[in-house]
């Protein structure tokens, strides 16, 4: 029933009862009874327009995606919620080792703002919040597959609808740790930015809030807004990423690196980063 409403939302903001009944192979009366039952559980929302319309929310969409991931064998169990942001909810999970499931929530914020900010969402019709989250998850998964393992990121495992599964990583956010060797950490971040650039990707939202540090290793997380290096604003977005990182290290650790010099290092594809930090 939930999948029938989901399918209908490709063409309708509020899916008509007859279409849901046809999709389920049930009569309208039985379909209406089940929809009202799901509505009481806050899995379906009902609206009386000039027809009776139904719509699912993110709770139902989470269940559909999770069921699909279990059926495919990607996930065998769901754990605690470990993070909530403006555009995602993150849970621990179990599968082939400890995992994380990131449920995208792009449509939960201003859809107009999200569509304007994300190139892969620009052509969506108004109100397609469900598919905004779906496309954001698939975009992030494709980017991670392109980067892994050359760039130090969590290993991508699977994607279903708006749910992205990846390996669970240890460590703390760069913003929260006190680094023993901040220069080495900055070098690793720049090296990974360089590798991503060589693979045709700019993070486009990089800061101390999406770099994880564990011992002498880092992992760069949160790639839904990443752009290709052929994007007309790629260089400006790369400069913004670099500004955020360099500003953090200058403020916290008094390590000063010129933005234009760092930009040349990341774009060079050579050994300029190593030479800079070995001086």
Q: Where in the sequence are the language-model features?
A:
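Short amphipathic alpha-helical interface segments
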Residues: 1-23
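Short, hydrophobic-biased segments on the C-terminal half of alpha helices
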Residues: 32-36, 193
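Accessory beta->alpha helical hairpin/"wing" motif in late/C-terminal subdomains of nucleic-acid enzymes
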Residues: 48-65
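C-lobe/activation-segment region of protein kinase-like
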Residues: 26, 198-203, 215-279
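Conserved kinase catalytic-core helix
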Residues: 19-21, 25-28, 131-153, 175-214, ...
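Short beta-strand "wing" residues that participate in macromolecule-binding interfaces
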Residues: 45-46, 204
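Conserved ATP-binding subdomain of kinase catalytic cores across diverse folds
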Residues: 29-30, 41, 45, 62-173, ...
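Short, glycine/acidic-enriched loop or turn micro-motifs at the edges of active sites
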Residues: 105, 170, 208, 213, ...
């Amino acid at each position: 029933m939930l999948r029938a409403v989901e399918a209908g939302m490709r063409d309708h903001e509020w899916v008509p009862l007859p279409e849901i009944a046809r999709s389920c192979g049930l009569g309208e009366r039985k379909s209406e009874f089940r929809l009202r039952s799901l509505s009481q559980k806050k899995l379906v929302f009902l609206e009386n327009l000039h027809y009776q319309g139904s719509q699912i929310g993110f709770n139902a969409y989470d269940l559909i995606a999770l069921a699909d991931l279990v059926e495919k064998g990607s996930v065998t169990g769901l754990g605690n919620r470990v993070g909530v942001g403006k555009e995602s909810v993150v849970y621990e999970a179990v599968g082939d080792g400890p995992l994380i499931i990131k449920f995208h929530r792009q449509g939960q914020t201003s859809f107009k703002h999200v569509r304007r900010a994300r190139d892969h969402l620009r052509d969506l019709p108004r109100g397609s919040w469900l598919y905004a989250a779906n496309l954001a998850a698939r975009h992030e998964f494709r980017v991670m597959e392109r980067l892994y393992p050359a760039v130090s990121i969590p290993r991508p495992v699977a994607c279903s609808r708006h749910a992205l599964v990846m390996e669970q990583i240890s460590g703390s956010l760069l913003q929260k740790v006190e680094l023993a060797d901040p220069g080495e950490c900055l070098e690793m971040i720049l090296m990974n930015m360089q590798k991503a650039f060589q693979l045709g990707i700019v993070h486009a939202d990089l800061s101390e809030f999406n770099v994880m540090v564990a011992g002498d290793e880092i992992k760069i997380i949160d790639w839904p807004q990443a752009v290709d290096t052929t994007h007309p604003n790629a260089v400006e977005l790369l400069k913004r990423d670099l500004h955020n990182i360099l500003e953090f290290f200058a403020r916290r650790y008094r390590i000063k690196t010129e933005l234009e010099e760092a930009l040349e290092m990341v774009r060079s594809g050579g050994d300029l980063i190593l030479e800079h930090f070995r001086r």
